[in-house]
Amino acid sequence: MKRDYYEVLGVGKGADADEIKKAYRKLARQYHPDVNKAADAEEKFKEVKEAYDVLSEPQKRAQYDRFGHQDPNQGFGGGGFDASGMGGFGDIFDMFFGGGGRRANPNAPRKGSDLQFGLSIEFTETVFGKETDVEIPKEAECDTCHGSGAKPGTGVETCKTCSGTGQQEVAANTPFGRIVNRRVCTTCEGKGKVFKEKCSSCRGSGRVKVRRKIHLNIPAGVDDGAQLRVTGEGEPGVNGGPPGDLYVVLRVKSHEFFEREGNDIYCEVPLTYAQAALGDEIEVPTVDGRVKLKIPSGTQTETFFRLRGKGVPHLRGNGRGDQHVKVRVITPTKLSDKQKELLRELAELSGEKPGQHGGEDEGFFEKMKRAFRGE
């Protein structure tokens, strides 16, 4: 039984679109098969994606909130009586005939399956975008038999199991009397024909494994977990149906200096004691190159400075986020005798003695002492 989609994403039913997107990204990153090697990681990833696909679309979400996992089109609507929409009756038919008795026409055209492919990209490529070619493993129509599955020149023959009808009749005694049900022939899979000899290249499947080169245009501003849809590059269709689509899931590599939150970039730079006390003009790395940043005198450690427009471009809009620079004052650990002497002189000029605190900082340390004493 499927779990509630809100429960899967760990959000409440009143969650807004941003909360749902944030929860999805966190869980997708946690369970993605490229990262998580647990046996159930792939299933959990699919469950998370399915929940997000529904809850991120307003129309689908509204329908889910009203009907849950139950298809509102089941039952007596349009297509007449459907045993699967009648609960217990569907179970009774399954009990006597199996779940495959009411399959749709197997010869009808069907869309091919969608494919999912994980692609790792660099941090800076999310900022500026990228065009690239990737090779995708997929199934394609067999060139030997042109998708028929039969060995060239051998042809097909009428299925002996169903006499070419594509269906089998199965009778069973039930509490309602003797019931005869039709189901898809298991020998020919409803086609009514079987191969005299299977194609040796595809072993009768009509498909072979290939690697197809796909051109991707990664837009600037994408984030980790984003999906690019490439229409028609999924598995080939069945019985002349259209091919499925390809979904490329982007995995952004971590950067040794930059971190990203939304469209803003964060980094940390060191300052010497003299730079923090006296002020300075330093160079700060950005994704666009180095820029000048003025540090005012008396700057404290962990102070943030903003570089406007140096963040990540907005994916659907104009402009870019900002870069936030946190400075950290580095305390020297190896001092020469001369440096120690100068620091002692500075302490004395400030009215302090080495190892003691006074002046404006006294109140801060007194508060710390009282907090430790529980006062």
Curated annotation (Swiss-Prot):
Record keyword Repeat present: yes
SMART domains attached to this UniProt entry: DnaJ
Cofactor note: Binds 2 Zn(2+) ions per monomer.
Keywords in alphabetical order: Chaperone, Cytoplasm, DNA replication, Metal-binding, Repeat, Stress response, Zinc, Zinc-finger
One Pfam family, short name: DnaJ
Domain named J: residues: 4-68
InterPro entries associated with the record: DnaJ, DnaJ_C, DnaJ_domain, HSP40/DnaJ_pept-bd, HSP_DnaJ_Cys-rich_dom, HSP_DnaJ_Cys-rich_dom_sf, J_dom_sf
Subcellular location: Cytoplasm
CXXCXGXG motif repeats: 142-149, 159-166, 185-192, 199-206
Swiss-Prot/TrEMBL GO biological process terms: chaperone cofactor-dependent protein refolding; DNA replication; protein refolding; response to heat
Sequence positions that bind Zn(2+) 1: C142, C145, C199, C202
Keyword Chaperone: yes
Start and end residues of each stretch annotated as Disordered: 349-375
Stretches annotated zinc finger (CR-type): 129-211
Family indicated by similarity: Belongs to the DnaJ family.
Function as written in the Swiss-Prot or TrEMBL entry: Participates actively in the response to hyperosmotic and heat shock by preventing the aggregation of stress-denatured proteins and by disaggregating proteins, also in an autonomous, DnaK-independent fashion. Unfolded proteins bind initially to DnaJ; upon interaction with the DnaJ-bound protein, DnaK hydrolyzes its bound ATP, resulting in the formation of a stable complex. GrpE releases ADP from DnaK; ATP binding to DnaK triggers the release of the substrate protein, thus completing the reaction cycle.
Domain-related comment: The J domain is necessary and sufficient to stimulate DnaK ATPase activity. Zinc center 1 plays an important role in the autonomous, DnaK-independent chaperone activity of DnaJ. Zinc center 2 is essential for interaction with DnaK and for DnaJ activity.
Official protein name in the record: Chaperone protein DnaJ
Species of origin: Brevibacillus choshinensis
Gene: dnaJ
